[in-house]
């Protein structure tokens, strides 16, 4: 899938009017043909409204209808009559009123795609549904482009020249109309649903099994090009030129979103309301503004899905499930919230979350990880990433900037990351953090400010440690994951997908400086451990590696114990002056008093002895001190004996391990699905500017490996 943004001059924000919703039931309005010579005929037959006539393109593949208004009340059926020769039916609404649809739309007689186009807005009420043989597109565009010409929603058209597939949606108004879906929109297997407008809110369901769902908001004065090339789907937003603007007929300014809701005759959507200030708000208290896409108390289920907002993408208490790839994209911020109901985003392929400015996630109201994928999970942002959630990937997990560097993130409550591949992120600041990977872990500086506050009673085997102290747990190269991805059958029974291999980058740990507010640091690696420094303010330090451990700085527990096991060699290169005035590399001294025990296990044997005072190969630059005992430079630990002790300091020497094994997680899980070669990370879309058109493309492509 390829998604690209081309900014346009003069994009305007939608004014949110001060309108209060009543409690009446959503009402539709009748379907009335437009008296413009298009030839559309509407014939009532009870609650069925048969739609015939219209104009066709020269090749007969495209059928055009024109309506003065288009709406359905509960129980009504709009029946588009097609033929086997008709590939696309396009119905425009020109009267200036929004379409309020609370009944059934169907197409019979042919396998035709249906396009419903109303620049004034579209509301699908709670009883709205589809019975279509092919794809459905709902849009508030002002023009639709073909390879051979342009279909004007307002004004005259030369219909016979409009040959080919509709591929471009033009939004000529500075304030494009909105779409609200409170219904249950579903298409046949293998077909697609597309909703494109200035602002999109869905509190109902969208289902396209084995097909695609695209929900996108577009700023005014933009054009969206949609094309299909094999398995590659392209959605591009670009500049509208002056010649096109001159072709428009008379267009009415659409209602603001609150006005649109009020015009529907009531609060048609569970989870959305208008507050006293005239702002549209969701149940989580988050506002919906111009350019947003909001999915609230909703279901999205398809093979591939792209939810793309020009401004904010807001996801509240919703269930997002795809058989393959899921893309959650925002020009500004991706916002995710739990509530009385859980939020889940589960992808049978890759899961990509991109907020160009910020990502703001709080989703801890579900016992299993809220974000799961059979492939990679990637968070992309140039701003703040707040990740209060549990993530489980059968591929790699990464938090990156838009340029591909490690991205920093924060968490105030409870972050847990599990990956059958590698894990990569930048700096982290927040509550206790747990990361487990079958592959490698790479991170920047890590600062733990306090314990988790939501893990009490959790089944996680480390819950007591994480919720009882400001703890850091990093485990790489594990054989099983305590919080492995547990994908439902309807996600995994789609296309065969193999995630990125967990051994692609080895199984080592590489991090920057670590500090905790008195909690433990536990690093266990199936390969090497490389880090800058650790300071725990009283917490215990545990380092365990199947191979080498290299610390460029120092280890300070300030009263806590230090327990180090290197399957091969250990080096601690930095020094500091501890509370007893000792120039130390490793210290557990507690502000001038004795501290915790220090135990070092290495495999230098007699050929590479451990030397206090020489960190070139196996040893420390400075002293090792527990406060009550100190081993000062220059001191080569004698071998034999295999264990050298001085007070509560012990250095154990052994032969190198021939087949070092990683430490498994405490709770074994079922064997995961096989994983594929890594896929290229998408190039992030950039936030449009108002003065300088640029071109940036987000490209992904479904890959099958047999």
Model-derived features with residue positions:
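Extracellular and secretory-pathway beta-repeat/beta-biased strand scaffolds
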Residues: 2-706
């Amino acid at each position: 899938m390829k998604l690209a943004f081309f900014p346009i001059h003069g994009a305007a924000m939608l004014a949110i009017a001060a309108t209060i919703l009543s409690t009446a039931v959503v009402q539709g309005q009748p379907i009335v043909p437009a008296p413009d010579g298009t030839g559309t005929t509407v014939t009532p037959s009870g609650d069925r409204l048969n739609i015939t006539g219209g104009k066709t393109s020269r090749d007969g593949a495209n059928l055009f209808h024109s309506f003065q208004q288009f709406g359905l009340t509960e129980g009504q059926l709009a029946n588009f009559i097609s033929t086997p020769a008709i590939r696309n039916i396009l119905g425009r609404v020109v009267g200036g009123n929004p379409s309020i649809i609370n009944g059934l739309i169907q197409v019979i007689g042919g396998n035709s795609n249906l396009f419903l186009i109303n620049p004034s807005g579209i509301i699908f009420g709670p009883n709205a549904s589809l019975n279509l043989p092919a794809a459905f597109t709902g849009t508030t565009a002002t023009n639709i482009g073909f390879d051979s010409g342009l279909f004007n929603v307002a004004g005259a058209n030369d219909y016979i020249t409009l040959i080919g597939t509709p591929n471009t949606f033009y939004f000529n108004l500075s304030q494009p109309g909105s779409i609200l879906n409170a219904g249950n929109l579903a298409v046949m297997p293998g077909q697609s649903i597309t909703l494109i407008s200035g602002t999109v809110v869905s509190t109902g369901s969208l289902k396209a099994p084995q097909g695609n769902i695209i929900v996108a908001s577009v700023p005014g004065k933009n054009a969206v090009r949609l094309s299909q090339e094999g398995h590659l789907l392209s959605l591009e937003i670009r500049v509208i030129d002056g010649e096109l603007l001159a072709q428009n007929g008379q267009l009415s300014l659409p209602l603001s979103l609150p006005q649109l809701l009020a015009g529907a005759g009531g609060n048609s959507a569970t989870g959305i309301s208008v507050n006293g200030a005239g702002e549209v708000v969701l149940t989580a208290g988050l506002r919906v503004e111009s350019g947003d896409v909001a999915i609230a108390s909703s279901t999205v289920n398809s093979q591939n899905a792209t939810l793309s907002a020009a401004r904010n993408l807001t996801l509240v208490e919703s269930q997002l499930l795809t058989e393959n790839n899921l893309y959650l994209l925002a020009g500004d911020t991706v916002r995710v919230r739990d509530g009385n109901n859980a939020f889940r985003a589960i992808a049978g392929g890759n899961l990509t979350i991109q907020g160009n400015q910020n990502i703001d996630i709080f989703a801890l109201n579900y016992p299993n990880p809220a974000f799961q994928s059979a492939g990679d999970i990637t968070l992309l942002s140039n701003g703040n990433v707040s990740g209060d959630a549990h993530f489980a990937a059968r591929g790699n997990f990464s938090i990156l900037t838009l340029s591909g560097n490690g991205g920093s993130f924060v968490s105030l409550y409870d972050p847990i990351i599990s990956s059958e591949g590698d894990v990569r992120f930048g700096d982290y600041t927040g509550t206790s953090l747990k990361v487990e990977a079958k592959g490698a872990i790479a991170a920047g500086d890590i600062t733990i400010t306090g314990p988790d506050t939501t893990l009490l009673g959790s089944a996680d085997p480390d819950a007591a440690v994480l919720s009882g102290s400001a703890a850091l747990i990093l485990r790489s190269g594990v054989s099983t994951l305590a919080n492995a991805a547990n994908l439902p059958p309807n996600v995994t029974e789609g296309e065969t997908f193999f995630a990125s291999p967990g051994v692609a980058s080895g199984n080592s740990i590489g991090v920057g400086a670590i500090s905790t507010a008195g909690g433990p640091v536990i690093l266990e690696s199936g390969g090497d451990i490389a880090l800058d420094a650790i300071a725990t303010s009283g917490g215990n330090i545990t380092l365990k590696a199947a191979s080498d451990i290299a610390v460029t700085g120092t280890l300070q527990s300030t009263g806590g114990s230090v327990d180090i096991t290197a399957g091969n060699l250990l080096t601690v290169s930095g020094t500091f002056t501890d509370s007893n005035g000792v120039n130390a590399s490793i210290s557990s001294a507690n502000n001038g008093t004795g501290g915790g025990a220090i135990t070092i296990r290495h495999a230098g044997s007699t050929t590479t002895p451990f030397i206090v005072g020489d960190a070139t190969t196996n040893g420390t630059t400075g002293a090792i001190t527990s406060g009550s005992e100190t081993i000062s430079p220059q001191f080569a630990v004698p071998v034999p004996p295999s264990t050298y002790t001085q007070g509560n300091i012990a250095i154990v020497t052994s032969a190198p391990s021939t087949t070092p094994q990683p430490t498994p997680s405490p709770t074994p899980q079922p064997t995961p699905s096989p994983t594929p070669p890594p896929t290229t990370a998408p190039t992030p879309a950039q936030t449009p500017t108002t003065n300088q058109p640029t071109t940036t493309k987000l490209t992904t492509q479904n890959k099958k490996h047999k």
